[in-house]
């Protein structure tokens, strides 16, 4: 993200949180030792874990890290606004006006969520779910009554010709690895809130595809 001349990169994933504090004691711990060049004791003792949504500032060469990595939302979610929708992966940051919108895939494993802050690296408050690939939560729908096979979704929001959209993927062929790209119109209210939108097959077409001709 080019934030008025400051280059920021957002990354990370989160395997386990308070409910699984010993998650990294399995084979993944050896991977972390190799990746980060630290001892097991250093990794297990790291405040807020080495996992989670992380931001670093880069030099203009886009290669050199300028500052220490920092968590942008809490790793420990109990008692926070993120308790029901902890971060899993898929960090994406957008600036809307003077607010920062952090879009991410949650541990619910079917939704794109967002959080809002005045700052790019702290102060985020959970905003809500933008889209669920099973329409879970849309107009109160329960997970038991989901409308499609659910699984991890990734994506973000973008403004095109004055209209905001959410881009994401849903699953096909009953496989978590068969993913169909989708888009829906969204609306950012004056107070910054984004209502959850329904999954459709219209995408950017502004309506159902005409039943004639051919499509790539």
Protein language model features and the residues they cover:
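Carbohydrate-active catalytic/glycan-binding domains of CAZyme proteins
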Residues: 1-216
């Amino acid at each position: 993200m080019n934030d008025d001349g400051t280059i920021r990169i957002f990354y990370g994933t989160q395997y386990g949180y308070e409910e699984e504090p010993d998650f990294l004691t399995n084979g993944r711990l050896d991977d972390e030792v190799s990746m980060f060049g630290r001892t097991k004791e250093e990794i297990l003792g790291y405040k807020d874990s080495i996992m989670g949504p992380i931001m670093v500032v880069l030099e203009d060469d886009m290669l050199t890290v300028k500052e220490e990595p920092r968590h942008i939302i809490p790793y420990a979610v109990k008692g926070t606004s993120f308790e029901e929708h902890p971060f899993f992966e898929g960090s994406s940051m957008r600036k809307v006006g003077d607010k920062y919108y952090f879009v991410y895939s949650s541990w619910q494993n079917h939704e794109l969520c967002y959080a809002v802050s005045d700052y790019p690296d702290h102060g985020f408050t959970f905003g809500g779910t933008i889209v669920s690939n099973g329409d879970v939560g849309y107009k109160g729908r329960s997970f038991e009554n989901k409308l499609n096979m659910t699984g991890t979704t990734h994506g973000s929001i973008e403004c095109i010709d004055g209209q905001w959209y959410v881009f994401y993927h849903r699953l096909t062929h009953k496989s978590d690895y068969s993913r169909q790209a989708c888009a829906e119109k969204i609306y950012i209210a004056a107070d910054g809130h984004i209502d959850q939108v329904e999954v459709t097959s219209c995408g950017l077409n502004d309506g159902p595809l005409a039943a004639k001709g051919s499509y790539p």
